[in-house]
């Protein structure tokens, strides 16, 4: 019998069905234009782009241009790649243009889909960013799709790490730019540390199309991107504390597997206090609860987490003497990514590797806040519907499930639940053997390196040939994936095989042709390809007859999306396939999150050894457990975002102010206002409002004016004059400070002083923002405890961070004013001393490099050691003294 909800959906259709239906007239319009665009010459396609560009700039809406633009891209792709986009691909592209997430299954051609909205939105001249999860995909997609964009008369760029600056700048100026989410985020942070606007890469954030959007905007959402600098080396402290952890008993700590937390018990705290006193890390009479002990307690907690929560070969691997993290969602290594707040160092101490120094944060942003900078955002993935609520609530993105071009023929079996892990693995091996014997390719999915290697040993014992794909063997990934769909192939893979991999039945034809050419370089490539294609077609037919790719998973992940990604490797483009999950009561998800009802159901059935429970109720119960975990993780991400939003508002203010300063030719008004505000603050401190003259601290004001404004003002004498009030003293100080700064303008020249002001402003903003980030980090780490006092941690954080921000701005004004009041040109004596140092340094350089490059002959009347003969070099020219430095960093340096 149908439920009420199901019945209503059958009658009225789902919201998703209605969205699909609404695009059909648009797709019909694009299809109707096809003959017209097929008739265009290659130049005609480019001319069409120019026509559409002019119309877009003239104000015609992109929605109105969409049918012609999509028809143009379809024709360009057909000519450049030999691929004609399906109607479902046009549909996916339309939803992306509308600012949605298009959920498209594996093998449906998402890479080509992105070209349609990218082209349409690039017509405005504001640029489009296509975002991928790794550099391999960014480079591959850029190289592949640049043929389409080139045929359309558009430019394509790619962004990657360690890219030369000029190349990166050119890539950002292209119509369409492919990049990884990490590199985009880091470039944004670097841009906001640059000294001038012409060095900034990301001029605007117009439209981003995010591939594997759930991975980037949900799985990575809690991970901040951090640009950091070195802090003090404390490796000895980590090593000392690490030795304490193995001495703990189980009663000294409690592990909460649901929240991945571990805490000391009262008994553990007492033991810890004694151990720290013996180790000399706590002074006699000191307690763990003293404020001075906060740092030690923090490091002990991190060491406990490193030992009890982080497992080698699951959460990280040790490679070439370094601790390298593993992404829990993709199973890939994350070189360069480090855990913060001393946790990474604690793991290094545990593993006995070199302990890298801690870092201090220079700038940071989360992906949630970075991608919300874009005027328009959209995304593609094979699995998004389970997180539709989060996409809508946090990013304002709708999710549309785009129908497949051909119906899915894959069979998804009910889960098989065994009592023990050993019984489960035995059943998987037996099933693999049966499939292998009939030639059906098998993909065995695991959640960790350890489990993938255990399955590998079991297969070896049975004499079954197989490949293993995990973070240890990531270099062979492309080859292993290419062969995973071949006749009788058996592949064990961690979550690495779950995303961005396309397993083709019969194997990858391009790789087969390449290998055949390497083996026989003298052969005719066309003949060889025809031979390989014939063999491939025959092998593919046998694989299809055997049932297509069989995906077996060794356990369910906390997230249904990860399970669905693994399922999606099978049954691409209407191919047959089969998926099955093998579970046991010892699995993490079953043990930690399985409901009591499920436990009772299974124990009441009296399972025999090797017997499995297979029932839709079990699936439903597990999915409820997964939904519960997903809901909890969503709440955690929302909570992190609420706190990060507070910092984000401040970040936007600081970065916007910084950009304004970089863009400004004259910052004189800004620094003058700052200086006058500093004077106002000094008057308020030493001559508080509504006080009498005999209550003023005039000596304190005089000393502070000398310190902060570099003025010897006789404030004490002024205050002693008859009838002088605080306002008159303020005016005299303003006049004196204005006069001092006017003298500096005269000494340096208007342009020179403007450059100094801009430099001091930017450097001080950067330094103060760094300090502020560190303060906010500390506040964030302790504010949670306010909840025990019945105070809302978020409100406490908002209020205190705002006060800290105001204090930072006050400190910024003071520092800028103080530094500018002390700049001066170098004296003749200082210049002579500098020239002597230069001459000595040049002598050493000549001695060290007698065969130096030839230098340009000096001009007539020019004496290298006499600045009076140098004329008026520009600040950015090479210094005439021959040091090789810019003039502004050498003899033109400011004192």
Swiss-Prot record:
**Main location (coarse class):** membrane
Q: Give the record's subunit note.
A: Monomer and homodimer. Part of the essential Sec protein translocation apparatus which comprises SecA, SecYEG and auxiliary proteins SecDF-YajC and YidC.
A GO cellular-component term linked to this record = plasma membrane
**SUPFAM superfamilies linked:** Helical scaffold and wing domains of SecA (SSF81886), P-loop containing nucleoside triphosphate hydrolases (SSF52540), Pre-protein crosslinking domain of SecA (SSF81767)
Cofactor info, note text: May bind 1 zinc ion per subunit.
* Localization annotation: Cell inner membrane; Cytoplasm
Q: Does the keyword Nucleotide-binding apply?
A: yes
Q: Which catalytic reaction applies to this protein? A: ATP + H2O + cellular proteinSide 1 = ADP + phosphate + cellular proteinSide 2
PANTHER family to which the protein is assigned, alphabetical: CHLOROPLAST PROTEIN-TRANSPORTING ATPASE, SECA INNER MEMBRANE COMPONENT OF SEC PROTEIN SECRETION SYSTEM
**PROSITE patterns named in the record:** SECA (PS01312), SECA_MOTOR_DEAD (PS51196)
Q: Does the keyword Iron-sulfur apply?
A: no
Q: How does it sit in the membrane?
A: Peripheral membrane protein
Q: Which residues bind ATP?
A: 89, 107-111, 502
User: Positions of the region Disordered?
Assistant: 560-579, 848-884
Q: Name one Pfam family in it.
A: SecA_PP_bind
List residues binding Zn(2+).
Answer: 879, 881, 890-891
The free-text function statement in the UniProt record for this protein reads: Part of the Sec protein translocase complex. Interacts with the SecYEG preprotein conducting channel. Has a central role in coupling the hydrolysis of ATP to the transfer of proteins into and across the cell membrane, serving both as a receptor for the preprotein-SecB complex and as an ATP-driven molecular motor driving the stepwise translocation of polypeptide chains across the membrane.
Which GO terms fall under molecular function for this chain's record? Answer: ATP binding; metal ion binding; protein-exporting ATPase activity
Organism expressing this protein natively: Ruegeria sp. (strain TM1040) (Silicibacter sp.)
For this chain, the family text in UniProt reads: Belongs to the SecA family.
Q: What is this protein called?
A: Protein translocase subunit SecA
A GO biological process held by the record:
protein targeting
């Amino acid at each position: 019998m149908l439920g009420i909800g199901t019945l209503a959906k059958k009658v009225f259709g789902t919201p998703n069905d209605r969205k699909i239906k609404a695009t059909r007239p648009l797709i019909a319009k694009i299809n109707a234009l096809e003959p017209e665009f097929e008739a265009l010459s290659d130049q005609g396609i480019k001319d069409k782009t120019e026509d559409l560009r002019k119309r877009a700039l003239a104000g015609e809406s992109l929605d109105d241009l969409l049918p012609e633009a999509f028809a143009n891209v379809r024709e360009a792709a057909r000519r450049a790649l030999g691929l004609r986009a399906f109607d479902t691909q046009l549909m996916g592209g339309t939803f992306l243009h509308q600012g949605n997430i298009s959920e498209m299954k594996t093998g449906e051609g998402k890479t080509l889909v992105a070209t349609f909205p990218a082209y349409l939105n690039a017509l405005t001249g504001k640029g489009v960013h296509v975002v991928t999860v790794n550099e391999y995909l960014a480079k591959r997609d850029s190289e592949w799709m640049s043929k389409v964009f080139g045929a359309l008369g558009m430019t394509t760029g790619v962004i990657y790490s360690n890219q030369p600056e000029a190349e990166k700048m050119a890539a950002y100026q292209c119509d369409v730019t492919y990049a990884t989410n990490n590199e985009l985020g880091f470039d944004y942070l670097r841009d906001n540390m640059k000294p001038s606007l012409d060095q900034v890469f990301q001029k605007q954030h117009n439209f981003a199309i995010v591939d594997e959007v759930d991975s980037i905007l949900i799985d990575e959402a809690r991970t901040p991107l951090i640009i950091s600098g070195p802090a003090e080396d404390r490796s000895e402290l980590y090593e000392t504390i690490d030795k304490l952890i193995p001495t703990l008993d189980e009663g000294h700590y409690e592990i909460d597997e649901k929240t991945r937390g571990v805490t000391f018990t009262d008994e553990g705290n007492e033991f810890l206090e004694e151990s720290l006193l013996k180790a000399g890390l706590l002074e006699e009479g000191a307690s763990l609860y003293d404020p001075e002990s906060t740092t030690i307690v923090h490091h002990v907690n991190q060491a406990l987490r490193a030992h009890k929560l982080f497992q080698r070969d699951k959460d990280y691997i040790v490679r070439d003497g370094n601790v390298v993290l593993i992404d829990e969602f993709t199973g890939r290594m994350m070189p360069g990514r480090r855990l913060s707040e001393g946790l990474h160092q604690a793991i290094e101490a545990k593993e006995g590797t070199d302990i890298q120094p801690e870092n201090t944060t220079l700038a940071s942003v989360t992906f949630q806040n970075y991608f919300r900078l874009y005027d328009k955002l959209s995304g593609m993935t094979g699995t998004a519907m389970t997180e539709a609520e989060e996409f809508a609530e946090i990013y304002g993105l709708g999710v549309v499930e785009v129908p497949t071009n051909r119906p899915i023929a894959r069979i998804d079996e009910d889960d098989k639940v065994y009592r023990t892990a050993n019984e489960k693995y035995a059943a998987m091996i037996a099933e693999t053997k049966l499939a292998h014997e009939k030639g059906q390719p098998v993909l065995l999915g695991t959640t960790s390196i350890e489990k993938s290697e255990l399955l590998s040993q079991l297969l070896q014992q049975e004499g079954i040939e197989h490949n293993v794909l995990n973070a240890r063997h990531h270099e062979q990934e492309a080859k292993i994936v290419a062969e995973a769909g071949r006749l009788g192939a058996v592949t064990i893979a961690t979550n690495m095989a779950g995303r961005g991999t396309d397993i083709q039945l019969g194997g990858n034809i391009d790789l087969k042709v390449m290998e055949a050419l390497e083996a026989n370089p003298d052969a005719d490539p066309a003949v060889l390809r025809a031979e390989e294609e014939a063999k491939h077609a025959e092998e593919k037919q046998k694989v299809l007859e055997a049932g297509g790719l069989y995906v077996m998973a060794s356990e369910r992940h906390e997230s249904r999306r990860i399970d669905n990604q693994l399922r999606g490797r099978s049954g691409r483009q209407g191919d047959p396939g089969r998926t099955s999950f093998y579970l046991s009561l010892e699995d993490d998800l079953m043990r930690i999150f399985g409901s009591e009802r499920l436990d009772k159901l299974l124990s009441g059935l009296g399972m025999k050894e090797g017997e499995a429970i297979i029932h839709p109720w079990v699936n439903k119960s597990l999915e409820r457990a997964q939904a519960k975990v997903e809901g909890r993780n969503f709440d955690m991400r929302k909570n992190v975002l609420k706190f990060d939003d507070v910092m984000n508002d401040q970040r936007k203010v600081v970065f916007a102010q910084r950009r304004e300063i970089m863009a400004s030719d004259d910052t004189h008004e800004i620094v003058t206002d700052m200086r006058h505000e500093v004077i106002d603050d000094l008057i308020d401190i030493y001559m508080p409002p509504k006080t009498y003259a005999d209550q003023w601290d005039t000596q304190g004001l005089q000393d502070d004016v000398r310190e902060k404004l570099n003025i010897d003002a006789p404030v004490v004498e002024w205050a002693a004059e008859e009838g002088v009030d605080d306002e008159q003293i303020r005016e005299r100080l303003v006049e004196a400070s204005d006069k001092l700064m006017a003298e500096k303008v005269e000494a340096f020249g208007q342009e020179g002083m403007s450059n100094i002001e801009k430099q001091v402003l930017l450097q001080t903003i950067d330094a103060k923002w760094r300090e502020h980030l560190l303060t906010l980090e500390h506040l964030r780490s302790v504010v949670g405890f306010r909840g025990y006092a019945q105070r809302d941690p978020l409100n406490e954080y908002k209020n205190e961070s705002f006060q800290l921000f105001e204090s930072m701005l006050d400190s910024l004004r003071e520092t800028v004013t103080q530094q500018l009041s002390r700049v001066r040109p170098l004296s003749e004596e200082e210049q002579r001393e500098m020239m002597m140092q230069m001459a000595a340094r040049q002598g050493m350089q000549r001695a060290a490099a007698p065969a130096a490059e030839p230098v340009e002959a000096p001009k007539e009347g020019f004496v290298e050691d006499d600045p009076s003969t140098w004329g008026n070099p520009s600040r950015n020219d090479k210094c005439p003294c021959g040091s090789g430095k810019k003039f502004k960093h050498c003899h033109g340096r400011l004192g």
